[in-house]
Amino acid sequence: MATSASSHLNKGIKQVYMALPQGDKVQAMYIWIDGTGEGLRCKTRTLDSEPKCIEELPEWNFDGSSTFQSEGSNSDMYLVPAAMFRDPFRKDPNKLVFCEVFKYNRKPAETNLRHTCKRIMDMVSNQRPWFGMEQEYTLMGTDGHPFGWPSNGFPGPQGPYYCGVGADKAYGRDIVEAHYRACLYAGIKIGGTNAEVMPAQWEFQIGPCEGIDMGDHLWVARFILHRVCEDFGVIATFDPKPIPGNWNGAGCHTNFSTKAMREENGLKYIEEAIEKLSKRHQYHIRAYDPKGGLDNARRLTGFHETSNINDFSAGVANRGASIRIPRTVGQEKKGYFEDRRPSANCDPFAVTEALIRTCLLNETGDEPFQYKN
């Protein structure tokens, strides 16, 4: 099993230093999305005291030419703190700081999708939009081979691995447990975890989160997963179809509701939202992965519990549909619906913004509407 060189360093020696007192100083790790729209970057600065709110955190900058975000001749980019969490790696009073990225002219960077998403969320805050996102991922060795798979072949076919227990069914649970506890410590709204259908594939759920919090919490949960995997010497990939062939892909099913949907006879509003979504399928497919639908085309085949990328469908308890209404929601006539189209590597800001635009702002057509400030 190929693991990284860093994971073989003596962690006991490191712990000697991590146990040293740090006085009144605080380490703040600033985290941002790079120019790929998928990768995360981070760097740390020292603060003189523990920040109590986001406003107490200073802006910072970085070299955008090294993160696919600018040219070397004008490479300074600004980091503007947006959300703060406890640091599960360095522990209290240290912080994780999720940032928006702005260019030299103070305009949002191309992959700063949070900026517009926040404006859209603020327009509908009175409707109390809630989201829950189910993040699937696959554990890989540093050689790009799925964790625990035979080096020269494949494990047994899918069937026993989903929510499986046992050394021959669950591959890499230590990482899952470490990530779960680290998220709870950080203050991430993590709802749960489970082993997925393909061996070495796992899922964690974030939510319910209201409005912009959905993207903040999911991105930082992804960062924590990458850092935990770094310590274990393996890689977490959000590729929506990491292994071609008769293996399940990886999605980020998104559950959505408004206050009206959650109240008595809310099913009426759920059905109205689904009707709007049915008329804007291609717009959503473009928003649901970083490559405008190309990544999802490998996953949304109509097989392996997915819908076909070219067709819109909806149904109660149907995991082969674009939109699934859970059976309990159909029975209680209120609740939420699940959009099964987003890919595992989607930007949650793009996904949640698209749902708000179509379902609550009643947008139509293939392009998002440009609202005046």
From Swiss-Prot:
It is found in: Cytoplasm, Cytosol; Microsome; Mitochondrion; Cell membrane. Palmitoylated; undergoes autopalmitoylation. Its main location: cytoplasm. ATP binds at residues 134, 203-208, 255-257, 319, 324. SMART domains: Gln-synt_C. Its EC number is 6.3.1.2, 2.3.1.225. Residues 2-25 are annotated as: Required for glutamine-induced ubiquitination by CRL4(CRBN) and proteasomal degradation. PROSITE patterns: GLNA_1, GLNA_ATP, GS_BETA_GRASP, GS_CATALYTIC. It catalyses: L-glutamate + NH4(+) + ATP = L-glutamine + ADP + phosphate + H(+); L-cysteinyl-[protein] + hexadecanoyl-CoA = S-hexadecanoyl-L-cysteinyl-[protein] + CoA. The modification Phosphoserine is found at residue 343. The modification N-acetylalanine is found at residue 2. It is a lipid-anchor. Keywords: Acetylation, Angiogenesis, ATP-binding, Cell membrane, Cytoplasm, Endoplasmic reticulum, Ligase, Lipoprotein, Magnesium, Manganese, Membrane, Metal-binding, Microsome, Mitochondrion, Nucleotide-binding, Palmitate, Phosphoprotein, Transferase, Ubl conjugation. Disulfide bonds: none annotated. Decamer; composed of two pentamers. Interacts with PALMD. Interacts with RHOJ. Interacts with BEST2; this interaction tethers a fraction of GLUL to the membrane, causing a decrease of cytosolic glutamine synthase (GS) activity and inhibits the chloride channel activity of BEST2 by affecting the gating at the aperture in the absence of intracellular glutamate. This is Glutamine synthetase. The lineage of its organism: Eukaryota, Metazoa, Chordata, Craniata, Vertebrata.
